Amino acid sequence: MRSRKGKLYSCLLGSLLVLTTVSAPAVAGFSFGKTVTLMQFQDMHGHLAPHAEIFPDERKDPNSGGIAKVATLIKQVRASNPNNLLLAVGDTTHGSAETTFSLGDAIMPALNALAIDVFLPGNWDFGYGPRVYRQRFVAGDYSTVLAPNNRTTVAWMDGRPGHEGQQCNTPGGLNATTYATCHVTKANFPAVAINLYNYNEVARAITGQTHPGYLVKNVGGVKVGIIGITSDVVPQQAQAFNTGFRFTMGYKELPVNIAAARAEGAELIVVLSELGLAKNIQLVREFPAINVMFSGHTHERTPEPIIIKRGLFGSNIGIVTEAGEDSFLGRLDITVYRGRITGYNWQLLEADSSVPEDPAIKALIEQETKTFVAGPDHICHTFGPNGFPFGKGHVLCDPLETVVGHTNPTIERFNVLEEVANNVMVDAFLDLALSLGETDSRGNLLTSDNTLSQTNGFRFDVVVLGSDDGFSGDITLGDLYDYYPIGATGALAEFTGGRLMDHWEGVLTNVFDPNPYRQRGGWFLGFTHNMHFDVELNDDFPRTITQGRIDLVTINGKKLDKSTTYTLASCYPHGNPVDEVCRTTGATNVRYVVGTPLGSGPTDMFGNRPLNISGPWYTQPPVNSANIFDPVRFANGGPLFLQVAPFNSSHPVDALRRYLATHVVDAGTHGLGRINAVTGIPASEYGGPGIVQPTQGAGPAWLKREFVLFDKD
C-alpha cells in the first residue's frame, strides 16, 4: 500500500489576501473543512476469483484480486469514514470465461451487493451488444428483447437462483424468435455518461442521451458532482457493440455538465472517465473546474497521484489517479472548505494474499461459478456469436481449472510494445494455419515466408506465474479465456504488404500520438516469431503525422514487400464486414478455420459438443459475404446481422489449446525481441516510471496539443 498526502495553500479573501498552509487531512480529527472518502473501483474485467498478480514493487503474489477481496477493502474503507462514495470506473462485466458465457451475469449479484454509488460504463461493457447493455444498465429499460445469439448464451440460467421465471429456452426451443421474459440481471446502481447517445440507425438521427451526464451526491454535508465520460473507442471495435449508440469524446459536453452540477450546489467536481490516462490528464489541464479525475481504460497504476497545479501559486489543483485492475482499490480522502480542496490523501490499496475474501460476496461468486468448475453442478456452456441462430455457437465443456499448458516465464499483459502472452497467441494462430496444408489465391503453399499473424493490443489479462520464478507454471483453460474473452473466430485472409504496413503505422500512431486526444485503442499488436520490427519513437526521427515510426519489417529475414500479397492468420469479430480481419480492412480471399466436434462426451443443452482440439481442421468460405449489417432489413422484420462464419468455426482459445498441447512457453521461443524500439520507449511525462504508455506519446513536439485554458473546438 502506498500513500500520498497533499499540503495545499488556500486563498481566503477578507480585507487582505491571506495564504494559509494546510496540512494533509486525516479521515478523523481534521478541523479545517470536511473530509470525504472517494473509492476508485476500476477495470474489474470480470475477475471473480483471486488470481496471481505482480505489484508495483515487483512482488509476485499467487492469491490476489477478485471481487470478494476488493469487497473486503471496501468494507474497511467504509468503516473508517462513513462519508464515502464507491465509484466504479468501467470494463466491469466482461473479461473472463464466466462472464463471457453468461453475458456478464456471473458477476452481477456480487456487483449489486457492493452498494456502488455511481457507475461509468467502459468500452468492454458494450461487448455483448446493445440489447444486453440496455437491459442491464439503462434505467427503466425492460422492453429490449435479446437477440437469438444472446439467448443461446444465457439459456442455461433459466430457473436458477436469481433467474426464476426467466424463459430464454422455452417455449419454442430451436425455433425460438423472441422472448420478452429472457433477460440479463439489472444493475441496481446508476450509470452516468455525458458522451453516449441513442441513435436511430434507420433515420440516422440522435434521439437523446442514454444516461444522465452527472449526479450530485450529498456526502457528509459536502455536495459532490460526479460526471461520467465513457470510452470513445467503441466505434472502432466490433460493429455489433455500438449499434444504436453514438459516442463523442465528451469535450463539448463537459463544461455544460460541470456548470449544471455547480448550479445544483456541487462543491467538488469528480470526473469518472474511460478515455485513458493521457486524455484524462489533458482534460484536467484544460478544465480547471475538475477537482478529481478517476481515470480508467488504460489499466495504469498510480501509487502516487498525478497533481495538476493551476491558479495563483498552484492553489487550485486537479488530482488524477488510475487504480489498475481488480487487484487494487483506490482511496482518496479529500478535505473541502467552501468549495476548495484544502488537503488530500491518496492510497492505492492492494488486494493481495493478506486480504481475506468477504464471505458473503464469496458465496455469491461460488453460486454463480459452480457450473464452470469440476463437481456435481458442472455443465457445458455455449456462447452464441453475433448473427448465429438460436442454439448454435462456441461450446465450452471442460472445467476452467483444467491445466492446458505450461509456462517457464511469468506471463502478463503490461507492456506497451510487446508481451510474451501475445507472442504465444500469434504463434498458435500461425502454427494452426501452416498445419492446414492450404494454398493462397495464387496457388502458393502457406509457409512462414508468406504467412504471418497479429493480435490486437488488448489489455485484459491475469498474471500466470511461471516455473522460472519458482511457481508451478500451470496454464489453465480459464487463463486462456482471461486473455481472449471475446467471441471471435479464427480466419485466414490476404493483404498486400502495403496495406498491412499502413495498418501497423496507424496503430503505432494511435498508441504514441503526441496529441493525447488522438491516442486511442489498446497497446501495440502482437506478431509472430517469423517477423521482426525496428521502430523509431524518438522526437527527431523524420516522419509525417501518420507515417514513419516503422523503420523496418522483415518476414523470415526478408524485408516486407509492399507489393507482395501475404496471408494473415488472425481473428474475425462476428458482425463486421467480411473484408475486416483483426481490425485490418481490405482483406481478400477470406476463409474461416473450422473444426470437428467431438464424437462422444457431454453436450450443451442444445446437443452440441465442443470441437476436437486434435482436429481435423480445415477452412470454409463465408456463409454470407454482403450486406452483413442492415438496420432497414431489421426494421422490416429481418435480422440486423447476418451470419458470416460457419458453424463449428474455431475460437482463438481452440488454437491456443492445440498449440500448448505440444509447446511449452519459453523465453527463448516466445520472449521479447520481435519489436525493437531502436531509441527506446520514452519515460512518461506524468505518473512516474511505473506508467506503461507514455502520456505524452512519442514524436515531434510540433505534433503536441498545446495547453490553452478554455480552448475552443
Pin down the residues of each PLM region.
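Bacterial N-terminal signal peptides that target proteins for export
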Residues: 2-12
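Sec-dependent N-terminal signal peptides of Gram-positive bacterial secreted proteins and lipoproteins
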Residues: 14-17
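C-terminal segment of classical bacterial N-terminal signal peptides
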Residues: 19-26
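Acidic, metal/ion-coordinating pockets
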Residues: 29-353, 424-431
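Catalytic centers of hydrolytic enzymes
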Residues: 32-41, 46-79, 113, 243, ...
